[in-house]
Amino acid sequence: FAAAGIDSSKDLYAVIWTTTPWTIPSNMAISVHPRFDYTFFERRVGAAELCGEEDCSAVKCGQESDGDIYVVAQGLLGAFLADVGWDEKDIKVLGECKGQALELLNTKHPLVDRKSPIILGEHVTLDAGTGSVHTAPGHGLEDYEVGCRYGIEVFSPLDSRGVWTDAVKDKDLEGVPYYKGNAIVIEKLQNCGALLAQQDINHSYPHCWRCKNPVIYRATPQWFVKVDKFRDETLAAIKDVKWIPASGEARISNMVEGRTDWCISRQRAWGVPIPVFYCEDCGEVIVTDETIENVAKIFEKESSDAWVKYSAQELLPAGFKCPKCGKNHFKKENDIMDVWFDSGISWRAVVEKRSDVLGHTPVEMYLEGSDQHRGWFQSSLLTAMATEGKAPYKSVLTHGFVFGEDGRKMSKSLGNYIRPDEIIKTYGADILRLWAASVDYRNDTKIGNNIIKQLAEIFKKTRNTSRFLLGNLFDFNPAEDYVRYEDLTELDKFALYKLNQLIDTVTEAFDNYEFYKYFQQLQNFAAVDLSSFYLDIVKDRLYTAGKKSLSRRACQTVLYEILQTLVRILVPVMPHQAEDIWMSVPECQKCDKSGNSLESILLSDWPKARPEWNNSALEDEFSKILKAREVVTRAIEPLRADKKVGSSLEVAVYVSVNDNAVLKANEKELSNIFITSQAYITDEKPSDVLNEYKEDDYTVWVTKAEGEKCARCWKYRKLNSDGICQECLDAIK
């Protein structure tokens, strides 16, 4: 103080600020931030301000005088003066220092005959107040933690009902509920001249998350696990676990690295008891291998209810005496284990005790909500590291929470949740499973009637696709009709190439637990690759080609492979639909690779991609064909809209494009792919053009189709006397 030019003979006050005046009697320290600047200032006051009564006989009354000296954080000085209603003109700044310089200076408690040291705390902020924080280790977590670092007593003179005990040593407070204490403490501070100001403000306050009632913090004696003893080993073990998503590793690492000792005791009437005894003669805490083993044997026979049923003497080994004083009067611990400790040892209780069935730890996966990094994932990890020295799991998957379509989090207490059995009753279990697979579970997600209805439509499309496949395989026997890969058309090979891609991407999605990608790939394959492309094109081959022709059997071969793969891919998410499809598959198509008939699709192997189908050259080839198909479709559409043509089979298309090598090589198949009666690759504009359409470097001319409409295939061609084309005549013969 001398260095700052401050007269140490004057009264010096550290100003604190609190929203819980009732905790002032429990104040044990004042916290300041080590790196904040603190200002010492003197307030010059007159008699009128010193006392409200003109005839007051106080020593300082009636004279102009230097006032007391106060210390407040520099960053809050202006706000502080405004709060207490002091004029800056009456303030004389005497000096400044860092909070670090104030460490371990003692202050005198205004209401209790004890000293409160100034300590350093990183939790101190400049958001509000004075920068000097009232610290009561018995009534706040941060206060408790900073107090422990300085060895400050944890003083909490309240009982379990929130009523002051005689430990408060204040007759005005003993037996009074804490919530009535604010008025009493404020009056006491006023009476002793220690209250500078008070005001009403709105601020957040802790409430019970379940019943929504306000709560208070009260420190009580507890049992702890000293995490420091195995923290480094735990952090190392975290790196060996696969975290899904990967961000989970950093999250739990930060929690373990920064966590304090783990409090494992709870004050409840039910739960697993803590097997500790106390000597009633000398107070010795008794917890030994011998006593724990004896209690464990009793619990194994009679369950943990025996702790309530029997006395301490009956639970201890026969003839047991206190190892400290030799007496034999004992009482039991009344606290129970933290339920997180209970769930945290499930790896031992469930897995290790049934190792003949489940194997040994580490287990393959723990799966729970993202809040369990602080809960089950961490408690399981800590118990396993403390006792086994290894993580109890190989991988951990976390998911977000479910919200309604209105964006509100679903909660049992709010009653705004959808019952799964209602969805199952209305739509079936597969729809609920499909919803779970469709969402990116790594984030919070939504569910509601509209979302379920949309998924039901997707489900129907998948089902309709399967019906189409089944309907066109009724006469296909793979043992007799299967067409070799080399005899398939380029279109057929491309369909199998896309099927191979589906197998690879879906398998990878499952391997990485990215089920939403499975949903996206399956939906895209069924809607785009099949319904809108391959199946749309091959209908003509299936319906008009000869029943046993190579063209039809080749197409059926592809449909057979698609169905065999699709039904297996459906199994993990939509097992009921998969089994329903399988029941409709002809018996000759139900054999596995060994030729054995599969009674249920659930017994089949997962599909594997075929190396011979991986013809990547088809990707580039058909990307150009698909582009041309899209352009041709857009060229025909205005004619259909104007009702100049009804079906695309009524037209012929002439396509001009700079890079036409691929289209020219497949020119004979283009009319089938475009679903027109004729298709030509040419740079010459035909006559009688119905529509000319340009897009990028494409030019498409649309004309009336050549010939007459075949009564069987509906294509426009040269017809015979029976009114059908030559291709249909050959098919009939």
Feature-to-residue mapping (PLM):
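Acidic, turn-prone loop/beta-hairpin segments
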Residues: 330, 476-504, 536-635, 639-657, ...
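Residue patterns forming the tRNA-binding/recognition surfaces of aminoacyl-tRNA synthetases
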Residues: 1-25, 44-46, 51, 104, ...
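Alpha-helical recognition segments enriched in aromatics with Gly/Pro capping
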Residues: 150-162, 268-270, 292-444
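Short cysteine-rich clusters marking metal-coordination/redox-active sites
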Residues: 208, 279, 322-325, 710, ...
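Short functional micro-motifs and their immediate structural scaffolds
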Residues: 216, 287, 329-331, 715-721, ...
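Cys/His-coordinated zinc-binding microdomains
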Residues: 267, 283, 326, 714-717, ...
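Protease-associated
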Residues: 38-43, 65-135, 141, 145
